[in-house]
Each structure stands twice: as structure tokens, then as C-alpha cells.
Regions:
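An accessory alpha-helical subdomain
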Residues: 183-193
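Short active-site-adjacent structural elements
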Residues: 29, 158, 192-197
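N-terminal catalytic or cofactor-binding beta/alpha core of small enzyme domains
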Residues: 2-153, 166-171, 178-180, 198-207, ...
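Generic low-polarity alpha-helical segments
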Residues: 156-157, 175
Length: 219
């Protein structure tokens, strides 16, 4: 009698590796932040064998990195993409470099406005993204999406979080499989109701989804 073929068990979502995306809350008197609306739309999805987890960071220098460090310990992601809003831009901006400086032109949501202070005292002058930003750019452009590689993430909370993320990832492996986690930052434009230039939310969501897929597929 032939033995029945054994079917490999399907791993539960809890056992799958995690990709973490973060967005920010609204700031500077605004009622919304498209970065949060965009990442929230793909929470819980399964992409390239990874479960997508998302979280909102406060637009505050001190609290944002405290929350991010907690999320890294909690989820142990293999991929981290932090997302922020960049008014005045018309494309998804794949950030190349984070610099070790805080120089805020406005106060954050906690009332802090650091000027010419380091993100990490004694840290390197800069960290490069470890995301495959050129592969992500090509994929986005081929899909007909507005995208670019950006050479500056600014000097507000977005750059602060970007630098802090890369500093944490440089110290040790935080991923559940003990392999080095990759990370970086993406800026999204305004939504149409916020002003011009802008991008529709559906396009942001599709672009971020494709960016995550490309990052996970690119060695």
C-alpha cells in the first residue's frame, strides 16, 4: 500500500519573518500625516514570505527613537522602512543618507526645537541606507510610479529617526533569524487635500507595497 504524500505544514503568521514599516502622526498644526495613512493600509499583509507590521511614531525628537527602539525589540524585523511626509516633493523619495544632526526649523509635537545638535553624541557623521534603493527605484519607475533617489532627508524628526534606525541596526542583529536587518527611509508627498505638489493615497500605498516587495526580493 502506498503511503499518502505528506504535505509540508504551512507556517503560521506568528512564525514568519517580519517587515516593519512606520509612519508619523500629524504635526505643525496639520490634521493628518500621509505617511501614517499609507503604511497603515498594508498592515497585516503577507509579502514575499514576510508579515507586515506597522506602527505610528510621534513627531517628537526624543519620543520617536524611544518608540522605534521598543518596536525593534518587539518585532525583531528583518526589514525596516520608516516613512515620513515631505511637503514640496512630487514623488516617492528613497532616501540615501542620514546625517548626525538635528536642526529644526519648527518645534516638534513635544515643543522641542533642537538646533545644531547631534542625533547620537559621538556617532558617525552619516549612515547610508542599507535598502536596495536603486533596485527599488527601477521597479517603481517601471510600474509607472513617480519615484526618485533623494540625497537629503532633512534635519527634522524624519532624519532623526532615519539616523537613529541605522545606528541601532549597525550595533547588532535585531532580526529573529539573527541575520543583519536592513533598513532605510522613504518620504511621501502631500495628499491632494494638503496642497501641491501631491500624490493620491492609493498611489502611495501601491508604491510602498512595491518598494517593500523589491527590497525583500533583492539580495
Amino acid at each position: 500500500m502506498k503511503r499518502a504524500a505528506q504535505i509540508a505544514p504551512i507556517p503560521t503568521l506568528a512564525l514568519l519573518p517580519c517587515a516593519l514599516l512606520t509612519g508619523f502622526d500629524a504635526f505643525d498644526g496639520a490634521s493628518l500625516n500621509p505617511s501614517w495613512l499609507a503604511v497603515k493600509a498594508i498592515d497585516g499583509e503577507l509579502l514575499v514570505g514576510h508579515r507586515i507590521r506597522v506602527a505610528q511614531l510621534p513627531t517628537a525628537f526624543d519620543a520617536s527613537l524611544k518608540e522605534l527602539k521598543h518596536l525593534l525589540r518587539l518585532h525583531k524585523p528583518t526589514l525596516v522602512i520608516c516613512v515620513g511626509q515631505a511637503g514640496g516633493r512630487s514623488a516617492l523619495s528613497l532616501e540615501r543618507v542620514a546625517i548626525n544632526i538635528n536642526d529644526a526649523s519648527i518645534a516638534d509635537n513635544a515643543g522641542a526645537q533642537p538646533l545644531d545638535t547631534p542625533v547620537v553624541q559621538g556617532g558617525p557623521a552619516a549612515y547610508f541606507s542599507t535598502l536596495p534603493i536603486k533596485a527599488m527605484l527601477i521597479a517603481l519607475l517601471r510600474a509607472g510610479m513617480a519615484a526618485e533617489v533623494s540625497q537629503s532627508a532633512g534635519t527634522f524628526v524624519c532624519n532623526h529617526v532615519f539616523y537613529g534606525l541605522m545606528h541601532e541596526l549597525s550595533k547588532k542583529s535585531i532580526a529573529a533569524d539573527k541575520k543583519p536587518a536592513r533598513g532605510g527611509f522613504v518620504h511621501v508627498p502631500f495628499l491632494p487635500e494638503q496642497g501641491a505638489p501631491s500624490m493620491h493615497l492609493n498611489d502611495m500605498v501601491a508604491g510602498l507595497r512595491l518598494a517593500v516587495q523589491t527590497a525583500l526580493l533583492t539580495v
